[in-house]
Amino acid sequence: MLSSLFPHRKFIRLDGGMGSMLQKGGMPVGALPEVYNITEPERIIQVQKQFVAVGSDIIYANTFGANRHKMAKAGYSVQELIAAGIRCARAACAGTEAKVALDIGPIGQLLEPLGTLTFEEAYDIFREEVLAGQDADVIVIETMTDLYETKAALLAAKENSDKPVICTMTFEPNLRTFTGCTVASAAMTLEGLGADAVGVNCSLGPDELFPIVEEMAKWTTLPLVVKPNAGLPDPVTGEYLVDPAEFAQAVAKFAQLGVTVYGGCCGTTPEHIKAAYDLLEQTEIAPRDNIAIPAAVCSASEVVQIDQPRIIGERINPTGKKRFKAALQANDMDYILDQAVQQVDAGADLLDVNVGMPGIDEKGMMIRTVKALQSIGGTPLQLDSTIPAVMEAALRVYNGKPIVNSVNGEEASLQNILPLVKKYGAAVVGLTLDENGIPKKAADRFAIAKRILDRATALGIPKRDVYIDCLTLTASAEQEGARETLEAVSYTHLRAHETKAN
């Protein structure tokens, strides 16, 4: 979708460092740049015109901090600041093919569990920005360190706009963000949620960003974005230390990773941007066709590849557990969390979460349980409910890429569950049963597995994210059924590999 804006471009050209350009032009430390959209629009337009002049295809509106938290004392509404910011960018792009991006940065408050801002409150703040920026051509979510906050922003963009969305996060040299998010978790989660391009901005200089982008390239099929700083500023003078020629040489190296969206962040001037684009025009960009993305799920901080048998702890489930039922009725979260800790300590790779029982608010309990589990550790979750509304509530507040447990061959299940899996970028367990129960024959179970997989892939769910469970009963009770299960597993596995080869 992003490439359709510039169908004949070898690569998409972003702009450079608006904030540092304004500071260089005399903006006082501590001033709110977004207010300049109204009080000194020509100052903003003049900077943006310089980036248009050197070939930038997308100009970021001066709206990075235009949210109700950061602008509480600005004297102008979010709507006024964003509308003025887009007008400035549009004026700078006049007479060219350059597009305008609504620029959305962090709120400036930490989300729970690190802070007090709830996911729902963050979503509402970002929704206000998106609605105010409907006149933009593109939405950019940038300089994020918290995957949970990025998810709130991306959902707000996808649910309230039809514009392409670019998401870039800020990483440390250890390949994690300030809040501990891994590169793989960011790439998987944001692609699953519907971003049109993902990458890295700010953080460090271009050389230091290379291993981060190299890692990201392993975990996403989306176009990759890189928008580095001009190195780090001199602690005495405040001047950024990487000059345009050095910046261009370093940025051009990203072509070997197949990066197709380039720009600059703090300290990058029109000279930096022009030098980089001139060199990139002479540089071959590696194709990223037929990328083999690993089958995996994640929390923000932990990735579990499904490349070997994995242990899923299933004790967070009231079925047959009198004490657990009592904990749910009493809202005893300490007991539930203790069950989680015990399972992780015993070697569980993932935790199944099922809080369904009569007499409680299952949706509310599921939300509280998922949030509580995320507050004590990073073990990825498998979300388990037979009620679609409960499943969606859990998917919405989960921070990462979970497994949905489960979908089956019944038409109602396929219609209700698979769209949720697609929207929230989850993996899913497919059970080989339908309205008639569990088929006795392996071939019939395979037929259901194929039906599930066909419906999933038709929605755009990657085949690697569908885990087929061929089901079985206790072997001592039904020995022939156990044999059929083994045959179904073998046949499904064989056909899956044949399809992959083709």
What are these regions (language model features)?
Residues L2-I38, F64-K70, E97-F119, K163, ...:
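N-terminal small/glycine-rich loop or linker at the start of catalytic domains
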Residues V29-L32, A98-E129, C167-E191, I212-V213, ...:
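Active-site-adjacent loop and "lid" segments of alpha/beta metabolic enzymes
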Residues T492-A501:
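Conserved small/polar residues in nucleotide/adenosyl-binding loops
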Residues L32-T39, V52-V54, I58-L81, V138-K151, ...:
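Glycine-rich, proline-tolerant flexible connector loops at the mouths of alpha/beta enzymes
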Residues T145-K158, G205-A217, T269-K274, I360-I367, ...:
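Active-site-adjacent beta->alpha loops and helix N-cap segments on the catalytic face
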Residues Y76-T96, A153-C167, E215-P228, A276-I285, ...:
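Alpha-helix-loop-beta-strand connector modules within alpha/beta enzyme cores
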